[in-house]
Amino acid sequence: MAISKSFKLAELIRHIEYDSTDDVIKTSKRTQDKNKKRGSETKTSTDVFNLDTFAHADFRAARYIVAMSKGTDFHSTEIMLIHDGTTVSITQYGVLQDATLATFDADISGANVRLRCTPASATSTTMKFDRTLVDA
């Protein structure tokens, strides 16, 4: 059975509410944006891995907020990267930590920009990130 456009619109409207006292639109459903992503990885080795990838033809720059934990140790950083189709430039700032839990690098492999992460310890380390991409 095909779902009509009017049904889809009615389904969307039932999850939207306008609060006139605060002038805010509230939703009861999470919306998806192709430029935003949230992810999580847990690693038990010091091998480098791709924390995230994206198509370099579609996006020019990315910003990540990464929060890591290993037992009672914590490490948070903000990462910005930009590429020219061949080379990726990366910078970290806003680093807050009580221990260095990982290092980061970036490169281009095939059609993708890769944010590479190397955990500092083979002890179970969890890396969570929020990503925002900017179109090319």
PLM regions: where:
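Broad, structure-driven detector of short, well-ordered beta-strand segments within folded domains
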Residues: 16, 30, 77-83, 104-106
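Glycine-rich, low-complexity segments
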Residues: 3-53, 132-136
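Surface-exposed ligand/attachment interfaces on beta-rich extracellular proteins
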Residues: 37-60, 69-73, 87, 98, ...
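Low-complexity intrinsically disordered segments
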Residues: 95-136
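Generic recognition of long tandem-repeat/solenoid scaffolds
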Residues: 25-27, 51, 90, 110-118
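Beta-strand elements of well-folded, non-transmembrane domains
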Residues: 68-70, 83, 133-135
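Terminal beta-strand-rich extracellular "head" domains
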Residues: 80-100
